[in-house]
Amino acid sequence: MPRPTLLIIGCGDVGCRVLKLLQGRWRLLALTSSPERCAALRALGAVPLLGNLDEARTLGRLGALADAVLHLAPPPAAGDDDPRTRALLRALARGGRVQTLVYASTSGVYGDAGGALFDETRAVAPASARARRRVDAEAQLRWFGRRSGVRVSVLRIPGIYAADRPGGHPRERLQRGTPVLAAAEDVYTNHIHADDLARACVAALCRGAAQRVYHASDDSGLKMGDYFDLAADLCGLPRPPRITRDEAQARLSSLQLSFMNESRRLRNVRLKRELRLRLRYPTVADGI
């Protein structure tokens, strides 16, 4: 029986972890806009394809090449929609071969939930342009799945961490001494180890249901300050200073503040029951 073919769009850190998991089991293709990355992708068992989601003319052949697509590419950095996903779906529709598509979205589509614990049936309420672009991408993918019959699954992903992920370990922030909110004003955050996220991507490719959303999150359920306190203790570093929200407004960047303005806790029952994923790092204490 021939091996199925997977095309990865946006093959960065998580995509490379997926390649390692699927070597020898799938025929692997990876879209890249950088010729310099081709050798590294080949070393991981993938056939590199040069193309750019911002240049639709480079995508024409994609739809006829793969049985499944893992879409890990982010939207552009500006605007309220995602033209990259639109260009990709047009290319895939022309080929007619793709049967399965998994999209890596963000839990930011929910906006602020006031610390509530909820599952994937909660309505989206994006509070930033960054999140609105993701909501637009999800809507495009749902429409594409219904129209074409492709089995589309969406992973809504929180903060990704791993010691070997660039910028993906709290140690760097702790060493900079970046403050966190005082306990009374702190927000809940959610996390997933990069290795578990790669495994969730594979599980969704194999077992994800059509038009189904899954929270790709671990079991931690920590507030942000508690997360960094735990990381500091595990790394043997000083705990970060605590400041009020008013002080944070004056001292932190708009991007840092955006993560402090949203509080939510993600249920991951579907991830475990439907995708049958057993987390290797169920809490950040296991993975840091």
Residues of each region from the PLM?
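NAD(P)-cofactor binding segment of oxidoreductase domains
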Residues: 62-103
